[in-house]
């Protein structure tokens, strides 16, 4: 039995703890905050609850694969402890771009339907391949057929932008709608693999889901699995330094044989070296996330997930790269009617504004935030600014997200050149020069949301168990 310390009780940390404890190892999770889930945090306003962080779940087969893996490793049964149900939304989202409005998947009556159908048919067949890559190491031989299928579609067009530009049959505005999804990795389509185009089609064909009760239910389910398997989870424990075989905290030290880090690489390095966490020159986007309880309902035609796009995406990406406020940005509006997802008695809304990772604190009247709120209100057809409908609200800024590690509040940390994608990604799950350290989380598997986080955990944990094995009974 190996003694393992897991740093961070976000989704990847909890998932790692559950699998490793289920395999028979002694696992302790250390979390500096007093809640489970990391960025996925449960808050309460005016007696109503909402969950921060990622709001939607795609590729449900990854969650099922995680549960199947958990069951295969030990005696605890996932069905007895996970207790997690999902509800599928009617559409992936409604997109607003200049004078265009469309749902994904595009409806038959829309003038983009023919182009969308062609695109969708070309990429639907890649959905199993994407799922395989989400849960497989890039050098895993079993992933080669999936990579081969993608190579046939993309050819030498490696980036999302180069591939989308090559689709002569597709209207320019629809190309922009598909390309905007690269912000799920925090960067522009010029800096992401063409895979992101296919992920849009896969999401549209499979649909997207929300856990009943909110996304934080995933963190709670993972914690129940971890505890059932024998892991210990300690909240409110701040790590002060990391040594060769122990972790120092404000409350004492924890020895380990192996260390699993879900922390941002900059934070991990600072704890290892004692040097300050520096602001990366190239980093992913951040956000100004506004969570509110509404005085009254939004119009009946407002869907659960709306995407308000900028008129000029290139200007947005340029501003984000320079870490300055954009003229217009991409904003998600997640609207939950009373009793729909959360057990609330009032409607709630999350207005999630893509922001530069500048580490700053903004409010509703910061000029660019104010402009964006007014633009969102106009696009949704509201008679007043959306914040005039707030009964109570809370704003989470880049300075808040910086507390989770990435300097400046970059949601996915520092970005890397395109050639460092896949097998060359840095940081890696495991570096032979640091044999006791393993990494999980968004920094080693950026983009792809919750499935990528869970998939990355499966990849890292499988490799770890191959190395250290399961304790003999």
Where are these regions (language model features)?
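C-terminal segments that line or cap access tunnels to active or ligand-binding sites in enzymes
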Residues: 296-399
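Rossmann-like flavin
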Residues: 96-192
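A glycine-rich dinucleotide-binding beta-alpha-beta segment and adjacent secondary-structure elements
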Residues: 173-185, 382-446
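A conserved FAD-binding loop/helix module that cradles the flavin
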Residues: 54, 442-465
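Active-site-proximal substrate-binding core of FAD-dependent oxidoreductases
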Residues: 466-473
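N-terminal glycine-rich phosphate/pyrophosphate-binding loop and immediately adjacent elements
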Residues: 2-128
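Helical element adjacent to the flavin cofactor pocket in flavoenzyme catalytic cores
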Residues: 198-243
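Mid-domain catalytic core of redox enzymes
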Residues: 240-344
């Amino acid at each position: 039995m190996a003694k393992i310390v897991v740093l961070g009780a976000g989704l990847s940390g909890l998932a790692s703890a559950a699998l490793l404890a289920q395999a028979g190892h002694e696992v302790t999770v250390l979390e500096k905050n007093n809640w489970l889930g990391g960025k996925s945090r449960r808050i309460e306003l005016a007696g109503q609850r909402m969950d921060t962080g990622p709001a939607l779940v795609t590729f449900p087969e990854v969650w099922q694969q995680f549960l199947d893996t958990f069951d295969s490793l030990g005696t605890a049964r996932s069905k007895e402890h996970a207790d997690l149900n999902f509800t599928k939304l009617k559409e992936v989202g409604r997109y607003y771009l200049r004078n265009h409005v469309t749902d994904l998947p595009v409806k038959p009556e829309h003038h983009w339907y023919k182009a969308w159908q062609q695109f969708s048919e070309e990429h639907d067949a890649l959905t199993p391949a994407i799922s395989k890559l989400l849960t497989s190491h890039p050098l895993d031989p079993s992933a080669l057929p999936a990579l081969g299928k993608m190579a046939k579609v993309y050819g030498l067009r490696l980036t999302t932008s180069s591939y989308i530009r090559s689709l002569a049959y597709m209207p320019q505005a629809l190309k922009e709608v598909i390309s905007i999804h690269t912000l799920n990795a925090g960067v522009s389509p010029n800096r992401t693999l063409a895979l992101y185009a296919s992920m849009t089609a896969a999401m549209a064909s499979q649909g997207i889901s929300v856990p009943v009760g909110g996304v934080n239910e995933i963190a709670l389910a993972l914690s129940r699995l971890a505890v059932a398997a024998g892991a210990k989870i300690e909240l409110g424990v701040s790590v002060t330094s990391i040594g060769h075989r122990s972790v120092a905290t404000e409350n004492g030290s924890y020895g380990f044989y192996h260390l699993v880090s879900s922390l941002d690489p900059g934070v991990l390095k600072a704890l290892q070296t004692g040097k300050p966490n520096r602001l990366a020159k190239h980093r992913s986007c951040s956000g100004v996330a506004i969570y509110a309880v509404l005085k009254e309902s939004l119009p009946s035609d407002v869907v659960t997930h709306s995407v308000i796009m900028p008129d000029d995406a290139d200007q947005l990406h340029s501003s984000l790269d320079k870490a300055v406020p954009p003229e217009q940005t991409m904003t998600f509006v997640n609207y939950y009617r009373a009793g729909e997802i959360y057990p609330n008695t009032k409607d709630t809304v999350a207005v999630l504004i893509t922001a530069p990772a500048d580490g700053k604190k903004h409010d509703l009247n910061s000029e660019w935030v104010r402009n964006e709120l007014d633009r969102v209100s106009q696009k949704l057809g509201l008679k007043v600014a959306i914040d005039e409908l707030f009964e109570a609200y809370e704003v989470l800024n880049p300075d808040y997200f910086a507390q989770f590690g990435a300097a400046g509040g970059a949601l996915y940390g520092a970005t890397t050149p395109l050639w460092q994608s896949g097998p060359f990604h840095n940081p890696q799950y495991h570096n032979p020069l640091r044999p006791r350290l393993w990494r999980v989380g968004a920094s080693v598997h950026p983009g792809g949301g919750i499935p990528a986080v869970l998939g990355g955990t499966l990849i890292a944990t499988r490799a770890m168990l191959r190395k250290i094995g399961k304790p003999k009974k």
